[in-house]
């Protein structure tokens, strides 16, 4: 990967008087980030849901389009006959809410600079002054939209999957692809970029046409599947709109770990600690991640934090995901039953068609959603569950927790079900097997740690969800005259 000379700035060795000028000029010089940048890579594992996909799969840093085959993938007499993938959108801009918080923080730094001229007690320029001068290039119109890096995420994922499963992604099967997407533009644009990646696979060297001009046509929008949480009244009332549902998130913000960071950042930026809060600290940390993910530059915002700070801020993010999308409340995962059942309906149909020696009508189903789509589903299936809940008070005990959102659902994260037909099976049960991949790596079964399952056994394990979990009932609010167990 190319790197501009002097791209990596070390504020500790740069002449203090020239620090601000150096930081400003670096933006123009650093268009790509060295994969092993020591400062950026030291914080990268802790960005939570704002994590780059390649930081979860470091092999992609050197060859993002080269297929990587997990040695646990089945081969030989077992042939993949269907692939069902749930894919999070690619890298995106911050939301308008995050942009406005960053603008607020930037304004605090500029106001401080206008009072004291940006000089420290030694008369030199400090980090706060340099950040005040750092270009704030985020604008409200960006509001969570997919960036070019996000389109690249999708094109490259398409190329890798097509190379990994050539029979399923054959040119003959192109017209039988099924694409479903959330109505959010970042998901629709991700699906379009994925299709362009497939075009590149089929027609190397030729520029892809617009998706509307492809023989496949645009994907189907289905928010009841991809944004099931928006259609679950119980979730909306008891979690989304409940001021106390994220108690542990708010308690951690005022706890000792976050308060220590608050004081440290206030001292570093030379602003009154009362002018800062946990939300502003978090948006500063995320700005480091956005600059890295979107532009590939090492932002001076990264210099505000060290690894210990990053671990605390990651936990704050994980607390929110845990209580709002994971194991915190049962309805978080149960609201995804319809999506889980839909996946198995596709697999059932493929099994039935194969048993009848019919062609598989939908060999590849691609569904584009959000981190909020994937996390509840993985929780429903029993993945990444810790022995104790994540709370505001057990940060140190959870240092080695399983539930780390950045490792589970980075940008472009994907959960893939692969159905195999095995020719030399001794019994009908052994004919069909399933493997799951998370972020292109084989995901051991949550209940056995095996890397492959007979399809019938997998269905039996999840029988309760497949047969008894009815979203209409799960999401129905208790009637007003019924007994409530709320405190």
UniProtKB/Swiss-Prot annotation:
- What keywords sit in the KW lines? Cell membrane, Disease variant, Endoplasmic reticulum, Glycoprotein, Hydrolase, Membrane, Secreted, Signal
Q: What does this protein do?
A: Multiple inositol polyphosphate phosphatase that hydrolyzes 1D-myo-inositol 1,3,4,5,6-pentakisphosphate (InsP5[2OH]) and 1D-myo-inositol hexakisphosphate (InsP6) to a range of less phosphorylated inositol phosphates. This regulates the availability of these various small molecule second messengers and metal chelators which control many aspects of cell physiology. Has a weak in vitro activity towards 1D-myo-inositol 1,4,5-trisphosphate which is unlikely to be physiologically relevant.
The keyword Cell membrane is annotated on this UniProt entry: yes
Q: Which GO terms describe its molecular function?
A: 3-phytase activity; 4-phytase activity; acid phosphatase activity; bisphosphoglycerate 3-phosphatase activity; inositol bisphosphate phosphatase activity; inositol hexakisphosphate 2-phosphatase activity; inositol pentakisphosphate phosphatase activity; inositol phosphate phosphatase activity
Q: Name one GO cellular component term.
A: endoplasmic reticulum lumen
What's the name of the protein?
Multiple inositol polyphosphate phosphatase 1
Record's signal peptide: 1-30
Instruction: Kindly list the organism's lineage.
Output: Eukaryota, Metazoa, Chordata, Craniata, Vertebrata
After translation, the protein is modified as follows: N-glycosylated.
Reaction catalysed?
A: 1D-myo-inositol hexakisphosphate + H2O = 1D-myo-inositol 1,2,4,5,6-pentakisphosphate + phosphate; 1D-myo-inositol 1,2,4,5,6-pentakisphosphate + H2O = 1D-myo-inositol 1,2,5,6-tetrakisphosphate + phosphate; 1D-myo-inositol 1,2,5,6-tetrakisphosphate + H2O = 1D-myo-inositol 1,2,6-trisphosphate + phosphate; 1D-myo-inositol 1,2,6-trisphosphate + H2O = 1D-myo-inositol 1,2-bisphosphate + phosphate
Compartments annotated for it: namely:
Endoplasmic reticulum lumen; Secreted; Cell membrane
BP term (GO), one: ossification
InterPro entries in alphabetical order: His_Pase_clade-2 (IPR000560), His_PPase_superfam (IPR029033), Histidine_acid_Pase_euk (IPR016274)
Please tell me which stretches of this chain the record labels as motif Prevents secretion from ER: 484-487
Effect of changing residue 331 to S: reported as: In PCH16; uncertain significance
Mutagenesis / variant outcome for changing residue 284 to D: In PCH16; uncertain significance
| Family per record | Belongs to the histidine acid phosphatase family. MINPP1 subfamily.
Q: Which CDD domains match?
A: HP_HAP_like (cd07061)
Tissue-level expression = Widely expressed with highest levels in kidney, liver, cerebellum and placenta.
Q: Where is the active site?
A: 89
Asked whether the UniProt record includes Hydrolase among its keywords, one would answer yes
Q: What is the effect of changing residue 41 to L?
A: In NMTC2; somatic mutation
What residues bear carbohydrate chains?
242, 481
Task: Give the EC number(s) under which this enzyme is classified.
Answer: 3.1.3.62, 3.1.3.80
Pathological association = Thyroid cancer, non-medullary, 2: A form of non-medullary thyroid cancer (NMTC), a cancer characterized by tumors originating from the thyroid follicular cells. NMTCs represent approximately 95% of all cases of thyroid cancer and are classified into papillary, follicular, Hurthle cell, and anaplastic neoplasms.
């Amino acid at each position: 990967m190319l790197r501009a000379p002097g791209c990596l700035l070390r504020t500790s060795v740069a002449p203090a008087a020239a620090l601000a000028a150096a930081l400003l000029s670096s933006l123009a010089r650093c268009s790509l980030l060295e994969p092993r940048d020591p400062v950026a890579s030291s914080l990268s594992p802790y960005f939570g849901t704002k994590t780059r996909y390649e930081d979860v799969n470091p092999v992609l840093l050197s060859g993002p389009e080269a297929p990587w085959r997990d040695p646990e993938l089945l081969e030989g007499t077992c042939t993949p006959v269907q692939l069902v993938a749930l894919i999070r959108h690619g890298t995106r801009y911050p939301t308008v809410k995050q942009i406005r918080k960053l603008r607020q923080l930037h304004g605090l730094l500029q106001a401080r600079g206008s009072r004291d001229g940006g000089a420290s007690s030694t008369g030199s320029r400090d980090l706060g002054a340099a950040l005040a001068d750092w270009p704030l290039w985020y604008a409200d119109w960006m509001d969570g939209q997919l960036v070019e890096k996000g389109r690249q995420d999708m094109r490259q994922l398409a190329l890798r999957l097509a190379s990994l499963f050539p029979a399923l992604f054959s040119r003959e099967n192109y017209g039988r692809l099924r694409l479903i997407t959330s109505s959010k533009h970042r998901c629709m644009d991700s699906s379009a970029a994925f299709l362009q990646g497939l075009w590149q696979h089929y027609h190397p060297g030729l520029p892809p046409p617009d998706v509307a001009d492809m023989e496949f046509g645009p994907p189907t929008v289905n928010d009841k599947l991809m944004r099931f949480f928006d259609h679950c009244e119980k979730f909306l009332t008891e979690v989304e709109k409940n001021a106390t549902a994220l108690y542990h998130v708010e308690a951690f913000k005022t706890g000792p770990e976050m308060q220590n960071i608050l004081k440290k950042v206030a001292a570093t930026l030379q602003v009154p600690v009362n002018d800062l809060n946990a939300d502003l600290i978090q948006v500063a940390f995320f700005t480091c991640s956005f600059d890295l993910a979107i532009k590939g530059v090492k932002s001076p915002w990264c210099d505000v934090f060290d690894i210990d700070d990053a671990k605390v801020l990651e936990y704050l993010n994980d607390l929110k995901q845990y209580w709002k999308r994971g194991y915190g409340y049962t309805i978080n995962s149960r609201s995804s039953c319809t999506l889980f059942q839909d996946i198995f309906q596709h697999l059932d149909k493929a099994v039935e068609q194969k048993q009848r020696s019919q062609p598989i009508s939908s060999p590849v189903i691609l569904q584009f959603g959000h981190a909020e789509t994937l996390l509840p589903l993985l929780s429903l299936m029993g993945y990444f569950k810790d022995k104790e809940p994540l709370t505001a008070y057990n940060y140190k005990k959870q240092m080695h927790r399983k539930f780390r959102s950045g490792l589970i659902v980075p940008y472009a994260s994907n959960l893939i079900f692969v159905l195999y037909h095995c020719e030399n099976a001794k019994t009908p049960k052994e004919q069909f097997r399933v493997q799951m991949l998370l972020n292109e790596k084989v995901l051991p079964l949550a209940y056995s740690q095996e890397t492959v399952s007979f399809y019938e056994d997998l269905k039996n394990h999840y029988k309760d969800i497949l047969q008894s979990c009815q979203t209409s009932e799960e999401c129905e609010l208790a009637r007003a005259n019924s007994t409530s167990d709320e405190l």
